[in-house]
């Protein structure tokens, strides 16, 4: 077990891929904002890549260990110290009973991850241990960790000394500028050609009013297509309003003139258009960005997004350990290639489904 001495700014229990299949119930996946760093932390301590671990935001916690344990720290460098002695990131470390791990502020990047051999043993909620702060579920009492709490851990048989290859570590931006991939849709036809060019050729500043629900961006004004300006009144008065529809995770919805990227704890539906979506393989960049950083967006195809996801899955495995050989990597690639690509969503069918759901809900309310 581990005792929380100082909680940090917002340190929470997360697992990967989080709470899957619950959007229909109104619950987002949650999970780590930077799943690349998160999974590698678990690989280092010989856990399954998705085992529950700690996500530390901006300022890390201080923890006291009640038993011997193997740990690994990845992601943003929060200058971890064990009993006052600096310890490295991206490798597994042995911690003895009564030793204290102290973490500070991140200078490059925003989130650090602490994985414990055996994983964190909190009670799953809807199939996941991930903390969803807004609803107060998952993690420890549904909140970020607090001083005095005990973090329960599973038994483990891991050893120290495992390291991640340098070329498998995500490269953090040191100039506060991030290039983020996006896929068009589902409502790209509500924005005109001028609006699309503006979005892809502009820098977008991450506002301070951003969290795990949504990233608010500041930038130029959008322009809209005739579909948005000559729509029916049921869609709302502003061009970016639309009949309530389902949101994909990573949706960039347009609230008036403000783009908001709906991240891990974002809503499952709403009444704003979504001209672009950030694919899952690019989420780690969002997770390591701080308010004041800027994004420029690069459009890619759905097929390219799927390829990036598959490549990242290969990296987030034991193939990235320093001791791994080429044969291990080839075996892992063959395993990944057996996984069928997710079929591209038919947004025409999606729109029809959401419209039908809206009409059914309205009729039910009218009967009441």
Residue ranges and their predicted role:
Residues 349-368:
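Single conserved hydrophobic/aromatic residue that forms the stacking wall/gate
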Residues 1-351:
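Conserved "landmark" site that anchors the functional core of diverse proteins
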């Amino acid at each position: 077990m581990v005792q929380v001495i100082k909680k940090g700014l917002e340190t929470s229990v997360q697992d990967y891929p989080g709470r899957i299949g619950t959007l229909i119930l109104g619950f987002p996946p949650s999970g780590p904002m930077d799943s690349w760093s998160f999974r590698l932390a678990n690989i280092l301590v010989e856990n399954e890549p998705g085992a529950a671990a700690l996500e530390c935001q901006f300022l890390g916690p201080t923890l006291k260990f009640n038993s011997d344990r193997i740990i690994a720290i990845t992601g943003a460098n929060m200058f971890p110290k064990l009993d006052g002695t600096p310890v490295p990131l991206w490798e597994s470390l042995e911690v003895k009973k009564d030793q204290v791990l102290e973490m500070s502020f991140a200078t490059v990047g925003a989130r650090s991850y602490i994985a414990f051999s055996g994983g964190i043993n909190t009670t799953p909620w809807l199939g996941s241990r991930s903390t969803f702060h807004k609803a107060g579920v998952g993690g420890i009492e549904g909140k970020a960790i607090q001083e005095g709490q005990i973090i329960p851990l599973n038994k483990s048989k891991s050893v120290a000394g495992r390291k991640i290859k340098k070329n498998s570590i995500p490269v953090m931006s040191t100039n506060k500028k991030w290039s983020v991939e996006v896929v068009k849709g589902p409502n790209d036809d509500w924005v005109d050609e001028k609006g699309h060019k503006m979005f892809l050729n502009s820098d977008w500043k991450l506002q301070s009013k951003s969290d795990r629900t949504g990233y608010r961006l500041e930038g130029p004004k959008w322009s809209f297509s005739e579909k948005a300006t000559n729509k029916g009144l049921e869609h709302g008065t502003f061009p970016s309003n639309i009949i309530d529809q389902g949101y994909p995770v990573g949706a960039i919805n347009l609230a008036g003139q403000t783009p908001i990227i709906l991240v891990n704890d974002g809503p499952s539906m709403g009444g704003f258009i979504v001209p672009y979506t950030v694919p899952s393989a690019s989420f780690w960049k969002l997770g390591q960005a701080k308010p004041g950083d800027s994004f420029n967006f690069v459009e890619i195809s759905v097929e390219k997004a799927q390829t990036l996801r598959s490549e990242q899955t290969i990296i987030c495995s034991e193939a990235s350990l320093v001791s791994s050989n080429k044969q291990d990597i080839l075996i892992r690639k063959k395993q990944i290639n057996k996984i069928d690509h997710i079929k591209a969503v038919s947004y025409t069918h999606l729109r029809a489904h959401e419209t039908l759901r809206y009409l059914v809900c309205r009729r039910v309310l009218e009967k009441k």
